[in-house]
């Protein structure tokens, strides 16, 4: 079993051509699409594109053999911790390192004309509120999961979950913001 937690995990996994005979699981549609570029069809959770969604998917079938969870350094270890606690042989591989910028000045300018911000990770929320957000801004915040909503709430801001992988993202944004 090989579980990819993000598109970046796929991009940075240097042995991608050696996993043909493995059960491949992707965290969500974006990760699955990245695997398709290498001609792999991955299983993905039905709805909840999260660690919990992966765990639910795994629990629907028999887990056999070893499992490798490929992720970014500093990413969540919920899947590995769950599998290890259930006595399944599980390893993690950090295929990339998340890095913050030295300066956010240029990026901050890009938000000056924005009406909303979509957050796809807890790290993006942290960076935004620590380095980019201006308290005078009246932006609306959207999150790709309830977990990200909770992180946004920790900054005392409200947000809504959006189906980021919708076939019509523009319409999804309009529906969510109304």
Range-by-range predicted roles:
Residues 1-178:
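Conserved beta-alpha
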């Amino acid at each position: 079993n090989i579980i990819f937690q993000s598109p970046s995990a796929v991009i940075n996994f240097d042995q991608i051509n050696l996993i043909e005979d493995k059960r491949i699981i992707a965290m969500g549609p974006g990760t699955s699409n990245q695997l398709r570029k290498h001609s792999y069809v991955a299983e993905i959770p039905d709805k909840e594109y999260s660690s919990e969604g992966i765990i639910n998917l795994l629990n629907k079938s028999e887990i056999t053999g070893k499992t490798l969870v490929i992720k970014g350094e500093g990413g969540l270890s919920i899947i590995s911790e769950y599998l290890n606690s259930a006595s399944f042989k599980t390893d993690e591989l950090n295929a990339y390192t998340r890095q913050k910028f030295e300066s956010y000045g240029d990026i901050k300018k890009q938000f000056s004309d924005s009406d909303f911000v979509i957050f796809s990770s807890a790290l993006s929320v942290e960076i935004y509120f620590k380095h980019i957000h201006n308290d005078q801004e009246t932006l609306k915040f959207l999150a790709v999961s309830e977990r990200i909503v909770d992180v946004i709430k920790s900054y005392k801001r409200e947000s809504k979950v959006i189906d980021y992988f919708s076939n019509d993202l523009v319409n999804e944004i309009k529906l969510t913001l109304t």
